[in-house]
From Swiss-Prot:
Organism: Xanthobacter autotrophicus (strain ATCC BAA-1158 / Py2)
List of catalytic residues: K183 (proton acceptor)
Annotated S-adenosyl-L-methionine binding sites: G80, W82, D103, D119, D143
Gene Ontology terms: cellular component: cytoplasm
E.C. number(s) listed in UniProt: 2.1.1.166
Name recorded for this polypeptide: Ribosomal RNA large subunit methyltransferase E
Similarity comment: family membership: Belongs to the class I-like SAM-binding methyltransferase superfamily. RNA methyltransferase RlmE family.
InterPro entries per UniProt: RNA_methyltr_RlmE, RNA_MeTrfase_FtsJ_dom, rRNA-MeTfrase_E, SAM-dependent_MTases_sf
Chief localization: cytoplasm
Residue segments, region Disordered: 1-28, 231-254
UniProt GO molecular function: rRNA (uridine-2'-O-)-methyltransferase activity
Length: 254
């Protein structure tokens, strides 16, 4: 468990950011939150590139997502925290598995991780990724977020749209039985997204790791047991959710 630094009296120590003429109120609040975030401090101490690494670590502890020898695609990988975690978990240093990190932005190299600076929406992206992986992916994971506008409904719709694009990409690169994990923001459109995922995966649920800030609407959608195109066609013809279970689990710790 990650706890904030404490003073001699046992109370958490807080860093207060002084007001600056060139700094907006929102940026000042963000900076103060970062400075007082125990996960930010721990990430620096342990060598992770971002606090988001702990979100994947915690989700993996609960769902056993990362297995040795897996082939993984990390969408919107910058700055690389999730790829770092996955590399350790799948045994990349021992020559096991394969990870391809994709982003429009360049990232500092991660030992053993292949990087593709590209748009995953490019027509040739799925084919290129499968070639780089040496086969279909076992896991497509995404911690991507659209640029925030500050308008909750707009931000929700934008990230749901981004996840829908990631799902379409995953359909083209995942191996049967594969897993899809992506960040979303609550706001009302989750049901439609989950219904779409249930056509392709045997189980769909929401996950909110402890490292996600309690006051944040952020959560993750986890879909396991990818059916593949043939199984999906049979499911559609039958007019059911398939032989597996498909459930939407309400997020906790809101």
């Amino acid at each position: 468990m990650t706890t904030p630094p404490r003073g001699p009296d046992g109370r958490p120590l807080k860093v207060r950011v002084k007001k600056s003429r060139g700094r907006t109120t929102s940026s000042q609040k963000w900076l103060q939150r970062q400075l007082n975030d125990p996960y930010v401090a721990r990430a620096k101490r342990e060598g992770w590139r971002s606090r988001a690494a702990f979100k994947l670590i915690e989700m993996d502890e609960k769902a056993r997502l990362l297995k040795r020898g897996m082939r993984i695609v990390d969408l919107g990988a910058a700055p690389g925290g999730w790829s770092q975690v996955a590399a350790k978990k799948i045994g990349l240093e021992e020559g096991l598995g394969k990870i391809v990190a994709i982003d429009l932005l360049e990232i500092e190299p991660i030992p053993g991780v292949a990087f593709a600076q590209m748009d995953f929406l490019a027509p040739d992206a799925p084919e290129r990724l499968i070639a780089m992986l040496g086969g279909q992916a076992d896991l497509v994971m995404s911690d991507m977020a659209a640029n925030a506008t500050g308008h909750k409904k707009t931000d929700h719709l934008r990230i749901v749209g981004l996840v829908e694009l990631a799902v379409e990409f995953a359909r083209q690169v995942l191996a049967p039985g594969g897993t899809f994990l992506a960040k979303v923001i609550q706001g009302g459109m989750e049901a439609t997204l989950l219904a779409d995922l249930k056509r392709d995966f045997t189980q769909v649920r929401h996950v909110k790791p402890a490292a996600s800030r309690a006051d944040s609407a952020e959560l993750y959608v986890l879909a396991t047991g990818f059916r593949g195109e043939a199984d999906r066609a049979e499911t559609d013809d039958a007019g059911t959710d398939g032989t597996g279970t498909a459930e939407a689990q309400a997020p906790r710790d809101q």
